Amino acid sequence: WGEKIFVTQPLEKEQERALLCIDRLDGKILWQRSVKYTEQERSHRTNPYCSESPATDGKRVIAVYGSAGVVCYDLKGKLLWKRDLGKIDFEWGAAASPVIHGDLVYIYRGPDPKAHLIALDKRTGKTIWQANDPAVSIDDRTDVFRRNKSREWIGSFSTPIIVTAKG
């Protein structure tokens, strides 16, 4: 945003998930904030922790850290709010980035047996609504899990997008 770049990074030795603010012109780290998370979390070797890209609206930056939660900082690194949204239990780990639109931040939490899309107030972190993924039978599936005997998972690995539907 402007001259700032925001990235997430796992600090595995420290057992932390970090958000870095980097100066776009010289590459210097302007600030770094991290969240401690010591519990074991499943993830794929090609999908390390902190795969989600942070999102900003120019006033705040929001980072999602899978099971380690969601954090919101102002652009100077002051913590505005933090939420624990529960654990994600999926063999490839979390990967969907948050999307800010209007006063809401949308976060997809899946694929997972409890997968859902959640909308939070970007100013407070309060849940505005949540839509749970429906259970799907194997015959209805079109994803790579078709051979999986689980009937509860829908495979979706992408970040939500905002579209206008029916008008």
What is the predicted role of each segment?
Residues W1-G167:
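Noncatalytic, solvent-exposed loop/strand surfaces
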